[in-house]
């Protein structure tokens, strides 16, 4: 083999080696490009998931803010809630009607009153309409010393009226807070005349005369809920005076005092009427 032939074959081998290297580099480049594209997809997916997570966090903060606002506005704080659903079997005559029975359970409080509710809602859906009714309602409330609430809860259960329950309980608690603050105000203003034997949460306030020992007035302030769930205050005046004073009361002032007090309430309102009565009874005309 002459020198030219050897040189030609050496060049062909070198070209073949270079071609193999080029193919290897091309394959590596394709793999790198594929890896880069995969990385871009993963990065894009991670970015989208991160944005979605940020949106969820933002929505959660918004819901927490709304929940806090509604709790402050209404006074209700719901602590626990659960729900179950059962599809109700329907008869042949109701085959076009879908019925779902929802069982709800929740507990919470409205200021000092705690409650537990269990109720069932039957949802009925046809081609024309969708409706729902409460089929059962059970209410447990504490503290139980509020006799008005016990009677009210029984009526709400009978009527299966959740809206009435929440609305009436809200206003009942508002009136209780107002009564407590009013009693506290007069106790601080007239400490030697006003007595709250059961504290500011009591429904009774005693007014004792500092000039005539044995003369007392008792304000009985009840908060009532009627059959329709309307909440309103009911204030009565009781008198405690010595028997001898009753015999000397020719103008029947003591006897007619409760009726006169109700008239005073209608003219002046609760706080002004109580203040006027206390000043009159204690001899404080300032």
Swiss-Prot record:
It is found in: Nucleus; Chromosome, Centromere. Residues 1-73 form a coiled coil. Its main location: nucleus. Signal peptide: none annotated. Keywords: Centromere, Chromosome, Coiled coil, Nucleus, Phosphoprotein. It holds the Pfam family CENP-P. One of its GO terms (biological process) is chromosome segregation. The modification Phosphoserine is found at residue 38. One of its GO terms (cellular component) is inner kinetochore. Component of the CENPA-CAD (nucleosome distal) complex, a complex recruited to centromeres which is involved in assembly of kinetochore proteins, mitotic progression and chromosome segregation. May be involved in incorporation of newly synthesized CENPA into centromeres via its interaction with the CENPA-NAC complex. Belongs to the CENP-P/CTF19 family. Component of the CENPA-CAD complex, composed of CENPI, CENPK, CENPL, CENPO, CENPP, CENPQ, CENPR and CENPS. The CENPA-CAD complex interacts with the CENPA-NAC complex, at least composed of CENPA, CENPC, CENPH, CENPM, CENPN, CENPT and CENPU. This is Centromere protein P. The gene is Cenpp.
